[in-house]
Structure formats: structure tokens, C-alpha cells
Amino acid sequence: MMRRKTWDLFCRVIDNHGDIGVCWRLARQLAASGEAVRLWLDDAAALSWMAPDGAPQGIEVLPWDAAARAESAGDVVIEAFGCELPAPFIARMAARAEAPAWINLEYLSAESYVERSHGLASPQFSGPGRGLSKRFFYPGFTLRTGGLPREPGLLEAAGSFDAPAWLQAQGIAPRPGERLASLFAYPNPALQQLPRLLAERPTLLLACPGTPQRELPGLAMPATVRWQPLPYLSQDNYDRLLWACDLNFVRGEDSFVRAQWAGKPFVWQIYPQDDDAHAHKLDAFMDRWLAAADPGLATASRRLWRAWNGLTPWTDITLPEPCAAQAQAQAWRTRLAGQPDQLTQLRQFIGKTG
């Protein structure tokens, strides 16, 4: 029987809760599989709504600053998204009789460099980690990357989901024939175009906290569109929201991945970067996602996504045809599900299988 491992997972909450969302899902999946996780956070406030029932058995949430006083380091140490580990903790890593697996978990991207960079090592020749080697783990969409987070039973849960019952329990009452759309967004000038985009059919827009709820009250709504504010949702309930809706507007990384597992049409708002690197990242994903799509669907999707992300003017933008978009979402999910999930690959990466 293989020994239970101890995992140290470090995350700095930069903004918008995307980093902590990814790390919390990983911590939960590790704990559910019997591993011990110490999650080191510089700001755990978001867990009050992301995980309202508290940390499950196997997860210990600790303040970042306390890592400098930790007595020992775990078997696996993950620094998420390039956060720099405290030097005293790195020294604890170097002091272990058996060096820990030191992993830099990178941001998700479909760009070509990901396949080239996945698995590369960075030997430490100086400093407190001298003698250790850090390795880079890149999530991605191909077999030559680290894959996507997908917990066991996720697709089965989505397939057996009772949307009407869940919506009723949340106080959401769509009218007969009304489309359900969810909205999770960063500040976005294109948001003012959304009511007109949705106006071609009756729509109930479910707005997540933050930018959507600040901006929507100031927008004129067509007679066919109404909106409802949502409270902060736990990760599990956010998944259910995506499953229940016909169309999902998502942002960043965590909700972007979950929208793909929902198997529903979605529109992605990528995290904007000052050097416009996000434009290349967006196009790289669309190139892969739409490679086998119907040409008409591909054209409409590219135009909408680029306009939604402020990369092209909002001129004659329409939603892709719903049936074609749904078929594309299902086909893409099936393709992704044929690849090993991220945790399976991460375990193989550090020399543990199963």
C-alpha cells in the first residue's frame, strides 16, 4: 500500500479569486483521495463563501506568514502561479532526508509554448534551496500538457443533475421558454452591449456578484431580457449554475474550465494584461477549440469573443446558432474527457501512480 503523502500548496490571492479557486479545487480533490494538504494563503477571506461548510477532512488552511515558522516541509510542495515561497520554508525543504517534489503549477494556456515547457526542471544552484530542483507543470488541452482539473464523477453528476429542482431551491424561477444565461465578468466596456445581444429571445440573466451587479442596474433592458442578482455561490453551486444555464459568460481560469466541463455554450472573458498578451492567449484557445467546428459557428464565435474582450469593435455581433453551439460544447467536452485529468497526471509527474 502506498504511503499517504503530505502536500504543501502555496497560493497568493492576487485579485478576483481565480487563483484561490483553482487551488481550493485541487486541495479538495487531494483530500478526497486520502492525501493530507496544507493550504498556505495570504488571504483566505474568499473561502467564507467559496467553501461555506469549512475545510473538509484532510485540508488545513494556514496563513502564508506562518510558513516561515513551519517545522518541516511536505512530500510535495506546489507553488501556484509562480508565487515565491518563503526562504525559511525552502530551507526546510532542503533539509529533508528525501527531497520533496517541488512543483510550479502554471496558468492554463493553449499556446504552443506550453507543450515545450511542460515538465522542464529548474535546478537550484544557490540560496536556501540549493541542491533542489523545481519543475514546471503546465495545465493544457493536449496529451503533451498536464491536462485539466476534473474530479471523479464530475461528468456523471452533471448528466444526472436536476436543474428545475436546484433552480427552485435557489429562488430562481424562469418563465416558460425563457433562456437562462449566467454572467461572471471582470470590468468590461462590452457589458453595455449584452442586453441587445440577448434580446432576440426571452432571457433571464443570472448575475454573479461583483462587476455584473454593479453595472447591470445602469443598463436599459429590452422587454425580452430581465436579470436577477445571485449571492456568492460555493464552488459546487457555481458548477450547478453552469449546468442549469443555456449560456454561460465566464472569466479568468477556474470558471473557464468549469464551463467547458458543463458542456454548455459559453463566452470567455480572459484576464486582461497590459502588454496585450491575453489576445494571443485567447486566439490560441479559439484555434484549438474551434478547429473541428462548423465554419459558420467558428466565425460567429470568434467575432463575439474578440469583441467581448475588447479586441475588435462591437459591430454586427450576434450569438452563435444555439443548436450548433450546444453540439460544439458537447463535442469539445467529450474530447477533453478522453484525456487524463490533471491530478492523475500530477501524481505521475511526481512519481506516484493511481
What do the predicted segments below correspond to?
Residues 9-128, 210:
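Active-site and donor-binding regions of nucleotide-sugar-utilizing enzymes
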Residues 200-231:
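Catalytic donor nucleotide-activated moiety binding site of glycosyltransferases and closely related
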Residues 151, 291-354:
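C-terminal amphipathic helix plus adjacent low-complexity
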Residues 97-101, 203, 264:
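A short helix->loop->beta-strand "cap" motif at the edges of active sites that frequently abuts
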Residues 107-191:
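A nucleotide-sugar donor-handling region in carbohydrate enzymes
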Residues 21, 188-196:
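A conserved mid-protein helix/loop that constitutes part of the nucleotide-sugar donor-binding site
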Residues 265-311:
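Nucleotide-sugar donor-binding patch of glycosyltransferase catalytic domains
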Residues 24-27, 233-281:
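A donor-sugar binding/catalytic signature common to diverse glycosyltransferases
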